[in-house]
From Swiss-Prot:
Named cofactor requirement(s): FMNH2
CDD domains reported for this sequence: Chorismate_synthase
The species this protein was found in: Acidothermus cellulolyticus (strain ATCC 43068 / DSM 8971 / 11B)
Family statement drawn from the similarity comment of this UniProt entry: Belongs to the chorismate synthase family.
EC number: 4.2.3.5
Residues that hold NADP(+) according to the record: R40, R46
Keywords: Amino-acid biosynthesis, Aromatic amino acid biosynthesis, FAD, Flavoprotein, FMN, Lyase, NADP
GO BP field: amino acid biosynthetic process; aromatic amino acid family biosynthetic process; chorismate biosynthetic process
Superkingdom field: Bacteria
GN (gene name): aroC
InterPro entries the UniProt entry points to: Chorismate_synth, Chorismate_synth_AroC_sf, Chorismate_synthase_CS
Record protein name field: Chorismate synthase
Amino acid sequence: MLRWLTAGESHGPALVAVLEGLPAGVEITTSVLGDALARRRMGYGRGARMTFERDEVEFLGGIRHGVTMGGPVAIRIANTEWPKWREVMAADPVPPEQLADLARAAPLTRPRPGHADLVGMQKYHLTDIRPILERASARETAARVALGTVAAAFLRQAAGIEVLSHVVAIGPVCAPAEPLPTPADRERIDADPVRCLDPQASAAMVAEIDAAKKDGDTLGGVVEVLGYGLPPGLGSHVHWDRRLDARLAAALMSIQAIKGVEVGDGFATARRRGSAAHDEIEAGADGVRRRTNRSGGTEGGMSTGEVLRVRAAMKPISTVPRALDTIDVTTGEPAKAINQRSDVCAVPAAGVVAEAMVELVLADALLEKFGGDHVVETRRNLQAYLDTLVVR
């Protein structure tokens, strides 16, 4: 079983992430993590923080000479802005007079619509939004991307599985559904300003972001994550919490601002008749196969061996420059929401985070099925399974 946790706040000294259950023998380095974290910062429409925030990452445990040792993998991602926030976010008590002249220390009392602010204050009996927004911030996703990068290395080295994402919609602009990108398109996708494979759609998306920025507004969109090389049989039909599609949906819905998930053709299948909704089976040169992949690579809660295809819908960023109406919780009077530094559109980055979450779920499912204390053992068990499939 693979388990992972993250800790840390947006303006704290660092984010910390722990991945437990990974086999020994997986090759991974801090430079690979750094490259992955840089991908998370890319995308047209990002805010000022992305231009000066850089991620200084290090392994704290579980790795020796670029190879996992079988113990928990611990990762630390430093916050280069920490000196500015040292007093405001200090773990130990700070004398009030030391905070009095710091604008950053002023209580935040105007909750932002669409954020965790208001309900977080209610739940945790707070009169200041700061403790809520610090942890609810999407800055936490840097830790998820780091963990997902380690999981991706395991998937690639143990099973040849590759996961990639691309943007299929920003605001009202949608990219063509076909062709699907492959791992060979990864660099081309990342080189695009909005991580969209279709040049015409990309240009229209950029224009839409420019228009939203001019209007003091924000945009959401849809990302698609694809998994190549999955064997049949990851997940299970026997219990709700072992179904692969359910685990993927939960993981994607856990990402900040994600409000919808679909697997394969998803909601479109609800508008079709059954004869046009399912994937018919035939014998191919390489064994049993499906003529189509409307299911998105899962049936009955298990991977089918076809390409995994999941989509996640991201709502527009809740911190709107043209501040939305709210109240000041100290007075109960109408007010404008606080306007923290933010992005116009973070959909391209959301795809990178979605990749990481899918990689973590697939790594967990692969270990659940094939086990292994060393990556060589996992690889051997997988090959033995494939060699002895009753129906192929």
